Amino acid sequence: MQTLKPYILLFAFLSLSLFSLGQDRYKLRTGDPNGINKWYMGRQIAQVMSHYGIDWLEREEREMEENTSLLLKNLAVKPGMVIADIGAGSGYHSALLSKMVGTGKVFAVDVEPEMIAYLNERIKQEKLSRIVPVLSTEQNLSLPENSVDMMLLVDVYHEFSYPYEMALSMLAALKPGGKLVLVEFRSEDSAVPIKTIHKMSEAQAIKEFKAAGFRFDKNIDNLPWQHYLVFTK
């Protein structure tokens, strides 16, 4: 028993150190009532849009407001690609991407079981055979390492309860040289009619993704309301 004691103490020390790092990374304090009172790198994390927001995700005005067609053109999808739609929700983007990947596939990743159930029904009804629904956790995508050519996150990253851990998981799932496209409403533009907590600045996004090991490539600044930020592994 005496010989085990140093190892037990070492394990306890390492566990406490890791816990302390997690506590230091996130700050708990009040702020915008539409947030979760948890802050990361000076940014308050927003509340998650639940499955009750499906009608808003599928609204007819979305193409006009966000120019989804241009967003998809920016992606330059090639047949055979493996794309992950992170925070896929109702499958609005996944359904469109599934028609662009040819023999490839689209991982439609979401943390809500209700969204995954909705996606499964949509796949069945619309015969979207290239879509693979994936239920993630708050800290892990549940995707294989080095399996994805491109990731797309549209208006969802700012809601992640554990943005650092999720960014690490995204980095791991991307193939070497793979791209991550982050689309977020521009906080720099007061004319964008979205609540402040559901916006992000370019500088904030770059700071957070660089902290997880991503390289910033470019901002394709051609969407009406949103940043289109490209990061690489």
Where are these regions (language model features)?
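Class I SAM-dependent transferase core
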Residues: 24-76, 81-82
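Class I SAM-dependent methyltransferase SAM/SAH-binding core
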Residues: 84, 88-140
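Helix-to-beta-strand junctions that scaffold the AdoMet/dcAdoMet cofactor pocket
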Residues: 101-102, 160-161, 174-176
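A short acidic, Gly/Pro-enriched loop at the edge of an enzyme's catalytic core
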Residues: 141-150
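A short SAM/SAH-binding and catalytic strip from SAM-dependent methyltransferases
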Residues: 149-163
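A short glycine-rich, Lys/Arg-flanked "PGG" loop and its adjoining helix->strand segment in the class I
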Residues: 164-179
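Conserved class I S-adenosyl-L-methionine
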Residues: 181-206
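Core SAM-dependent methyltransferase catalytic element
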Residues: 212, 218-233
